[in-house]
A protein has these predicted regions:
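Histidine-centered catalytic micro-motifs
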Residues: 153-160, 244-245
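Non-heme Fe(II)-dependent double-stranded beta-helix
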Residues: 2-20, 27-155
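Short, glycine/acidic-rich beta->alpha junctions
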Residues: 88, 154, 167-168, 222-224
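Active-site region of the double-stranded beta-helix
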Residues: 139-148, 157-168, 174-186, 191-193
């Protein structure tokens, strides 16, 4: 994931679609073999299994809930690997210049892991039951906390991580592996950005068919918005506004 601050053909939505919908699909614009190579380097850094987690006894000795995510310049695997395949991709660069201007900069880059339920120890499942935004960082062993680990994330805006910042940034996601509906793909709500900033948790009702939401913000606005599941091949790139619910 990248948070990126202030003559291209946009796949699927186009630049006009970004303004209207609050997100843009660029498609599989990064070479798949290069994505495989990068993913292999990540996989070699640790065993992706239940061994990522502290034991209950270890956690209770010193429970920590703050600063458990990689930051810029601190405890961040993404800063130790060559990401030129993303950062120097011509389509990405030109897209960001179109949206943010020629002097855009990367605020943060990091790897995000969507954790399978079977990896998670039962005591952590119980401890996080009912929590809307389940960042598993507090339960991860310190030596593995250089990535972000999620499960069961409720709809939110990325502004939640930058409460004091003007929302002049976008979030850009790159799939390093093929992602289908069974692999916790991104689900976002096109046009939901039109309500602007809203505090978490958001007042949202999901339709029975899970194809739309009824969104009521704190200022009294209410509207139905469609949901879009973002599946794609390795190398697929998407980006969205700081206000887009996902």
């Amino acid at each position: 994931m990248f948070l990126i601050d202030q003559k291209i053909e946009f796949f699927m939505t186009g630049l006009d679609g970004f303004v209207e919908n609050g997100f843009c699909e660029l498609g599989p614009i990064i070479d798949g073999k290069k994505c495989e190579s990068l993913l292999n380097k990540v996989v070699q850094t640790r065993e992706f299994s239940s061994k990522l987690f502290l034991s209950k006894e270890e956690f209770l000795k010193n429970p920590e809930f703050r600063d458990k995510n990689p930051k810029k310049g601190k405890n961040n695997l993404a800063e130790k690997l060559d990401l030129d395949l993303i950062e120097k991709n011509t389509i990405i660069q030109e897209s960001m210049e179109k949206v943010l201007g020629p002097n855009y900069k990367i605020l943060l880059k990091k790897f995000i892991v969507s954790v399978p339920l079977q990896w998670i120890p039962d005591w952590i499942k119980e401890d996080t039951k009912g929590i809307a935004l389940t960042n598993l960082g507090p339960y991860i062993r310190p030596e593995y906390s250089d990535m972000t680990y999620f499960i069961g994330v409720d709809f939110h805006q990325d502004l939640i991580d930058y409460k004091e910042k003007t929302a002049n940034f976008v979030t850009l996601y790159v799939y390093l592996d093929d992602v289908d509906v069974n692999m916790s793909p991104l689900v976002l709500s096109p046009r939901s950005h039109i309500f602007g900033a809203d505090t978490f948790p958001h007042n949202i009702s999901i339709s029975d068919d899970q194809n739309s939401i009824e969104y009521n913000n704190k200022k009294g606005r209410s509207e139905k918005f469609e949901l879009k599941t973002i599946i794609g091949k390795k190398g697929s790139v998407n980006f969205w506004t700081a206000f887009t619910l996902h």
